[in-house]
């Protein structure tokens, strides 16, 4: 049994958290303390949370700590933090995803991430 466990054991685990879970005057600077403990982050893309300034700050802080960056997409529901039901057609959902991932990619390109 030990031999089987050794062959299937996980050698590395990506310890991940969400960042930029704020917008405007509603800041959450405590979340940046997590950067010392994670290997990657998902940065909110501005629809359920995040705004351009918050997104930029989160990505730059992740870069400082050498933490990998991913996109945390969400529904266009900032008041409900993305938790309320949203009805979308398939092409609308696709556009929503492309738009949000594009925003993160643009920040990454602009700041050399």
Region locations from a protein language model:
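A short alpha/beta connector and helix-capping loop motif
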Residues: 23-55
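Charge-biased, low-complexity intrinsically disordered regions
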Residues: 4-8, 23, 105-106
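Active-site beta-loop-alpha junctions enriched in small/polar residues
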Residues: 18-22, 44-48, 74-80
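Hydrophobic faces of well-ordered beta-strands that scaffold small-molecule active sites
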Residues: 13-17, 41-43, 69-73
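Acidic (Asp/Glu)-rich catalytic clusters
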Residues: 32-36, 57-70, 112
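N-terminal basic/disordered segments at the start of proteins
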Residues: 13-27
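Glycine/small-residue-rich loop that forms an oxyanion/phosphate-binding "nest" at active or ligand-binding sites
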Residues: 78-111
